[in-house]
Amino acid sequence: GAIIIAETVYENIKNEKQYHTMQAFPGIKSKWERYDRYDFKFKNRNAIVVVPQKAAPGNPWIWRPAFFAAFPSVDIALLANGFHVAYYDLTHLYGSPHAVKLGTEFCNYMRDFYQLSSKVTVEGFSRGGFFAFNWAAQNTDRVACLYVDAPLCDLFLWPGRDNKKLWNDVLKEWNLKDNQMTEDKGKSIYRLKALAEANIPIINVCGDSDEAVPFEQHMNIIRKRYLELGGTVRVITKLGCGHHPHSLTDPTPIVNFILKYTK
């Protein structure tokens, strides 16, 4: 009703017809890498959806829970392949049960209101990787594949108890006392059985000289265990590379992997 009234007033003042057009997604519309971008709030947290010029059949999408637009070569390539690119900011929630719940609600919203695919590719960079493993293990029926890049896989190594401020942030987000943060909560390896049983494929990119999240202490442990469980995992190692830059300048191997498992 308010829209009709506004259009009528505009027409009387300007003596020209004004038509209201619905946006594809809520929020503020802008451009990102040539594509329509929508910024909005969901459950009081920042969300972004970037829309392909022509959506691929089934409306496939990739979702980042942290660090929108950082090293976006894969996202840009997938947009060209008809994927929606979504971001829902759960960066500082450390993969907590609350974060997992919010992520599920966001995915339901994207599916139910905007008809995006019921299965999503989850893209976890750094600490976003820890969330990706946690969320995927509890939502295996909603996951097409995982793309994790230099992922944090062990909260006891980062931030670790020695970093008292960040460790207290972890405990606060998890609503735990220190002695309640056990290995089955703080290590991604405990998520792998559920992922392997659901045949969730994983692609990983890591630098072999990462000092922030060392490959041998994080993703290589995941790789070995996932293979033991019969899971599909591909690791791309960048020689001489540290934690940054993430991704690949030529993202073709990652994109092809994602396309293979979203058909």
Set out the residue ranges of the language-model regions.
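Primarily recognizes the serine-hydrolase "nucleophile elbow" in alpha/beta-hydrolase
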Residues: K119-L166
